[in-house]
Amino acid sequence: MVVKVGINGFGRIGRLAFRRIQNVEGVEVTRINDLTDPNMLAHLLKYDTTQGRFDGTVEVKEGGFEVNGNFIKVSAERDPENIDWATDGVEIVLEATGFFAKKEAAEKPLHANGAKKVVITAPGGNDVKQLFSTLTTSILDGTETVISGASCTTNCLAPMAKALHDAFGIQKGLMTTIHAYTGDQMIVDGHRGGGDLRRARAGAANIVPNSTGARKAIGLVIPELNGKLDGAAQRVPVPTGSVTELVVTLDKNVSVDEINAAMKAASNDSFGYTEDPIVSSDIVGVSYGSLFDATQTKVMEVDGSQLVKVVSWYDNEMSYTAQLVRTLEYFAKIAK
């Protein structure tokens, strides 16, 4: 049985999700909705500065485009309630516009023309279950109509924090994500809505201090860590490829080897482990939501207790997208 998917919003995440889905058996994209001209969408699908060329054929046709010989209808509806998902058999909508990230707004397609489920490609509200790895799919029972893939940074931080907490118990911690610049930053200094003076500065020429939603989201995806972690972001001049540092105090004293062993034992298809001396360009295109770097683990003795630092890499584009597609695939299997 093939599960048919619609993508609402064909930006960075929407396009990369489309690429990933091409290799998922039993899942097929039959409708894309985006306000951009289909010629532009097809071109941006085919050519990608950071992720490389699409491994397939893309040809613009009337009403959409043909990918690897399969026609995908493209619409340009501003309101999701006006999208005729049923005509193309869409069962699950990947909500990737960024404008409908709350449950009430994300549910619009469910009340219009046949869609049954929605996966939000952004942190949802407190009333939406958020998943960060294949391990957390157990929180779903199949009756959910809307779920969230959380954020790229949460998908990096959470499995590392969970593995550390499960093994040794986290008391308190501070995280910093050193994050690639993104499309909501300026290329050159200029006026920007929202009043964020730092984001008004050139993203590819500056280290830009910023906030991160992961500091709050961690308590939603791992309730036992609620209120225990805080943090911030530093946007840096690379197009993709990011890293999260977590400094914590633990319930017990540990060694570097013990920490790395616990992380290696916790590794899976969502949470990778490496002992190679990698740099940010080495993780572009990686499918792990979080890739733990054992070479950067540090333990510092402080008056009989310890400060522990752990580090995990992520491609803030593809790592997150790979997680979303895994979530979507599982969601499709258990849908009731």
Swiss-Prot record:
One of its GO terms (biological process) is glycolytic process. It comes from the Bacteria. NAD(+) binds at residues 12-13, 34, 78, 121, 316. One of its GO terms (molecular function) is NADP binding. Pathway: Carbohydrate degradation; glycolysis; pyruvate from D-glyceraldehyde 3-phosphate: step 1/5. Homotetramer. This is Glyceraldehyde-3-phosphate dehydrogenase. It comes from Streptococcus dysgalactiae subsp. equisimilis (Streptococcus equisimilis).
